[in-house]
Amino acid sequence: MATEAPIEATEVPPASATETVAKQPHKLERRWTFWFDNQSKPKQGAAWGSSLRKAYTFETVEEFWSLYDQIFKPSKLTANADFHLFKAGIEPKWEDPECASGGKWTVTSSRKANLETMWLETLMALVGEQFDESEEICGVVASVRRSQDKLSLWTKTASNEAIQMSIGRKWKEIIDAEKISYSFHDDSKRERSAKSRYTV
């Protein structure tokens, strides 16, 4: 009775390099965390930030798109709610050591579609490390309000005007905004509507 010859290892077709690469997740330069904050029904006497919740931390392109598509679109938010994307390890609070001496670039919009587009463009720029001063950036906040929505890019060193202006010009280009302004967190702590220190 004839027996089948054993298959030599060299006869087994190797998996193509492209298939192997396609199956591997695409790691980002750093880990990022999505946060959620809903201030629509604040509890009496609750401290600011008490409704802030850490949602998901991710480190691959695939995880980012899955989370964005399923959850983290501003159009899914109710009024007085916020989405945050910050570097892992940094909390979206003035008190965080990385944010304490910082400030934020802000753009406002009265159209929900604009906020959605600017939010996505900013997220892609952050996780894709498109800013030359990426180490100076803490994260971004999308705030949905009844009258006007707001997008804020938080940075570490408010007093360094040269760095902030460079970041501001780049961000303005990314989101295709007419005007954005920068305020210091220290000013915001003292006054509800802090004046703008820089504008582009």
Swiss-Prot record:
Q: What happens when the gene is disrupted?
A: Plants lacking both eIF4E and eIFiso4E are semi-dwarf and exhibit an overall reduction in polyribosome loading.
Q: Which residues form a coiled coil?
A: none
The record lists its disulfide bonds as 99-138
Effect on the protein upon substituting residue 163 to A: In strain: T024242; alleles eIF4E2b and eIFiso4E-T
Q: Which GO terms describe its molecular function?
A: RNA 7-methylguanosine cap binding; translation initiation factor activity
PANTHER family, sorted: EUKARYOTIC TRANSLATION INITIATION FACTOR 4E RELATED (PTHR11960), EUKARYOTIC TRANSLATION INITIATION FACTOR ISOFORM 4E-2 (PTHR11960:SF60)
Question: Can you tell me which family this protein belongs to?
Answer: Belongs to the eukaryotic initiation factor 4E family.
The subunit structure is: EIF4F is a multi-subunit complex, the composition of which varies with external and internal environmental conditions. It is composed of at least EIF4A, EIF4E and EIF4G. EIF4E is also known to interact with other partners. In higher plants two isoforms of EIF4F have been identified, named isoform EIF4F and isoform EIF(iso)4F. Isoform EIF4F has subunits p220 and p26, whereas isoform EIF(iso)4F has subunits p82 and p28. (Microbial infection) Interacts with viral genome-linked protein (VPg); this interaction is possible in susceptible hosts but impaired in resistant plants.
Q: Sorted alphabetically, which keywords does the UniProt record give?
A: Cytoplasm, Disulfide bond, Host-virus interaction, Initiation factor, Nucleus, Plant defense, Protein biosynthesis, RNA-binding, Translation regulation
Q: What does this protein do?
A: Component of the protein complex eIF4F, which is involved in the recognition of the mRNA cap, ATP-dependent unwinding of 5'-terminal secondary structure and recruitment of mRNA to the ribosome. Recognizes and binds the 7-methylguanosine-containing mRNA cap during an early step in the initiation of protein synthesis and facilitates ribosome binding by inducing the unwinding of the mRNAs secondary structures. Key component of recessive resistance to potyviruses.
Gene it is expressed from? eIFiso4E
Modifications after synthesis and translation = According to the redox status, the Cys-99-Cys-138 disulfide bridge may have a role in regulating protein function by affecting its ability to bind capped mRNA.
Q: Does the keyword RNA-binding apply?
A: yes
The protein's superkingdom reads Eukaryota
Other information = Displayed sequence is allele 2 / eIF4E2a.
Quote the protein name from its UniProt record.
Eukaryotic translation initiation factor isoform 4E
Which residue positions does the secretion signal occupy?
none
Tissue and organ distribution: Expressed ubiquitously in seedlings, roots, leaves, sepals, petals, anthers and dehisced pollen, with highest levels in pollen, maturing anthers and roots. Strongly expressed in susceptible plants but not in resistant ones.
From the Swiss-Prot or TrEMBL record, state where the protein is found.
Answer: Cytoplasm; Nucleus
